[in-house]
Amino acid sequence: MKRTMLYLSLLAVSCSVSAAKYPVLTESSPEKAGFNVERLNQMDRWISQQVDVGYPSVNLLIIKDNQIVYRKAWGAAKKYDGSVLMEQPVKATTGTLYDLASNTKMYATNFALQKLMSEGKLHPDDRIAKYIPGFADSPNDTIKGKNTLRISDLLHHSGGFPADPQYPNKAVAGALYSQDKGQTLEMIKRTPLEYQPGSKHIYSDVDYMLLGFIVESVTGQPLDRYVEESIYRPLGLTHTVFNPLLKGFKPQQIAATELNGNTRDGVIHFPNIRTSTLWGQVHDEKAFYSMGGVSGHAGLFSNTGDIAVLMQTMLNGGGYGDVQLFNAETVKMFTTSSKEDATFGLGWRVNGNATMTPTFGTLASPQTYGHTGWTGTVTVIDPVNHMTIVMLSNKPHSPVADPQKNPNMFESGQLPIATYGWVVDQVYAALKQK
């Protein structure tokens, strides 16, 4: 009920010009912000070494006290054509767009929900069935709970859904198979719960697929149109989009991902599977095949400059410049740890205990929150140190280490940099050793 009381205290606001004036990002130097430049140079050399031994590319941006103090790119946005190394790779720049993977959950779906809740159009205790007609238990369900499932259950990843039903893969999904957005919603409704809602936290893409559909139900717009017109455009963001190739971007502006489509170097097969190098299309299978590239759980592309503004909006308490998206009470509600698991906020992952060290390192404050993405992305927002870090990369743009043993382990994923906390710790160490 604590979250409900917090919600009731929110003031309805609109994403329009507000009387509030929020900090905007400016450029500064690491020295002026209190960083040890030699420690940052050591980090630079370490990242370069990781790229030299096979990590595809990295973009890193650091904000301290409302100032961008570090921004750099390493490696190649595309260096493979299929399994063959290119003679002339496409170099990564600080403007390169990356497939955000599950960071979509935060910077599209959560931002939309935070705005809608701040406006009083949604409540965390609303039942899913209020917005998704036909969402209910069936007589044959072994585990019931859909009838009373709430938005907050999905945000907490405690709704009972399996982690990944693999809807586009008929051999795995069986009767839940779908490669059509409308049909996918029906398959989600039929997806059996695996545990009693509210009894534990199991991270699930299905939760955010449903939340994306709820945003569309409330706004009457496709998810991509709503966030692009009502969130990104007011903030002046021009490089944060779903389906970038359909919206004026060229492949050369985007980091490539998997070498041989979604086949994991030839060991995965299902109807319509892509087999050529993924370049400008979302990697995630459910987002691409089952949702047309636009889903609440994956599909968003962006660069570090745009993500910096979105992270600063969170740090500011819901606004940027003259634009207010939501208020500080909403930010607090979404980033407060669950009573059952201190690492889960409402969607946001929180640095609540040592299990989050691979994401946030060992030096970030316990109040730090953010998210990761399967393609090699991490965002870190630390309100105590007033610092944010975004690292974008294209980790799957390398061969699979052993397709037969583990088709989801890429060679690049075995490098230390694939554990984001290593990079995060080096940033904090540079700040703490002036």
Swiss-Prot record:
One of its GO terms (molecular function) is penicillin binding. One of its GO terms (biological process) is proteolysis. Disruption phenotype: Not essential for cell growth. It catalyses: Preferential cleavage: (Ac)2-L-Lys-D-Ala-|-D-Ala. Also transpeptidation of peptidyl-alanyl moieties that are N-acyl substituents of D-alanine. The keyword Cell inner membrane applies. It comes from the Bacteria. One of its GO terms (cellular component) is plasma membrane. It is found in: Cell inner membrane. Belongs to the peptidase S12 family. YfeW subfamily. This is Putative D-alanyl-D-alanine carboxypeptidase. The lineage of its organism: Bacteria, Pseudomonadati, Pseudomonadota, Gammaproteobacteria, Enterobacterales.
